[in-house]
Regions:
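N-terminal export/membrane-targeting signals
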Residues: 1-29
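Signature of exported/secreted
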Residues: 32-36, 41-388
């Protein structure tokens, strides 16, 4: 158990847990999208044309979207710009790239990850100040390299997946997972999330050894905290002027892995230079990591314990482009560097781990399904033949 290679593997499992679990299931702060207020009431503009809408059961239904009359006006009497969600059906594509270097027992370990998740968001109904939405994971792509050992998975191209991929079943379990999110339309706080039990069950079936850990880090509170940043990048008062700033804070308790506190400072910067129809919001993020509060707490099935940590975030920046006409975040980009040390205990032996990590995330919205659904076929498709 004390062999250096085993220890490095265990540490990697812990550090990989957050990116996998926080699939942005609901889009973390970095997955937050910029949002714009409708310029005027125009159902034809805001509603994806029928011919462009994706087909199949995964297609969000426009009839479920909140009515146009609920959208706030473009500007108030003071000339401020009003930002508000319209809660119409839309899709998200979220890509996160992580470069990580660790030094464990004088051994250098590098890890590179590129993760892409495809989501659909479908408004189901409104109940007073509440709106209920369904979020579905439509596709998952992973490209991971740990110390020169590649792991790849692509749910959109099953034939390209390696049957010997040790994490293939785990990645597959993420695909097609569905959640029901109840959101306060005024505060953008997530009041309730349904689908947690079924989601955890799927992941446990794919890897039963992870059950204790998943039960701890995928609590309902944790899922709510991960969901809120998708919507609450705009101020609750709605109307802003250039230079206006506002703050948000979230805490993500990952049990035996530790606690992550994010402090976000947003600043409205006016119309985007490249596209005047989008409003630009700058983001400054401060990420603070705290080790598990109780040293005696169960390790959640992990073969090690995190006893202490000194991690500092640097160069954190981001931009949100909000589409007021469609009432949603059109695009967001964020990046952050994390550096420091972790004190890990395994088998009664304390070891120091030096960590250096750079992460960037881009999230884009669309009216059409970014994942092409192909009919089942026993024969592999001819790449030269156009899809029908």
């Amino acid at each position: 158990m004390l062999h250096a290679r085993r220890l490095m593997g265990f540490v990697l499992v812990a550090l990989m847990a957050l990116p996998f679990v926080a699939v942005d299931l609901f889009g973390q702060a970095k997955d937050d999208k910029t949002k714009k207020e409708p310029v005027k009431t125009d159902t034809k503009k805001d509603t994806p044309k029928e011919k462009d809408a994706p087909k199949g059961k995964d297609t969000p239904k426009e009839k479920d979207a909140p009515k146009e009359k609920d959208a706030p006006k473009e500007k108030d009497a003071g000339g401020k710009v009003a930002l508000a969600w319209k809660f119409k059906p839309f899709y998200q594509t979220m890509t996160t790239t992580t470069d990580q270097k660790m030094k464990v027992m004088s051994n250098d370990v590098t890890q590179k990850q590129t993760q892409t998740f495809y989501f659909s968001w479908t408004p189901i109904k409104e109940e007073g100040d509440k709106v209920i939405l369904e979020q579905k994971i439509l596709g998952v792509k992973m490209d991971i390299d740990i110390g020169g050992s590649p792991i790849r998975y692509d749910s959109t191209a099953p034939g390209a997946n390696n049957a010997n991929n040790p994490l293939g079943q785990f990645f597959q379990a993420l695909n097609n997972s569905t959640f029901t999110v109840t959101l306060d339309r005024k505060t953008y706080k997530v009041l309730k999330i349904d689908g947690r039990d079924e989601f955890v069950k799927k992941l446990v079936n794919a890897n039963k050894q992870m059950q204790p850990l998943l039960n701890k880090i995928l609590s309902e509170d944790a899922l709510r905290e991960m969901a809120e940043p998708t919507f609450n990048v705009i101020p609750t008062e709605g109307a802003v002027e250039i230079g206006k700033t506002w703050k948000k804070a979230t805490t993500l308790d990952m049990g035996p892995i530790g606690k992550y506190t994010n402090e976000y400072t947003y600043k409205y910067e006016g119309a985007d230079a490249a596209n005047k129809n989008l409003d630009k919001i700058g983001i400054d993020t401060k990420l603070t990591y705290l080790p598990p509060e109780k040293a005696s707490e169960s390790a959640g099935g992990l073969p090690f314990r995190i006893k202490g940590a000194k991690l500092e975030s640097k160069n954190s920046k981001g931009t949100v482009l909000f589409n007021r006409e469609k009432g949603r975040v059109e695009k967001s980009t964020t990046s952050i560097d994390l550096n420091g040390t972790l004190d890990i205990e395994i088998g009664g032996q304390l070891t120091s781990v030096t960590l250096s990590q750079s992460q960037s995330t881009e999230v884009t919205s669309s009216d059409t399904n970014p994942v092409e659904t192909k009919p089942a076929d026993t024969k592999p498709a001819d790449p030269k033949q156009p899809s029908k």
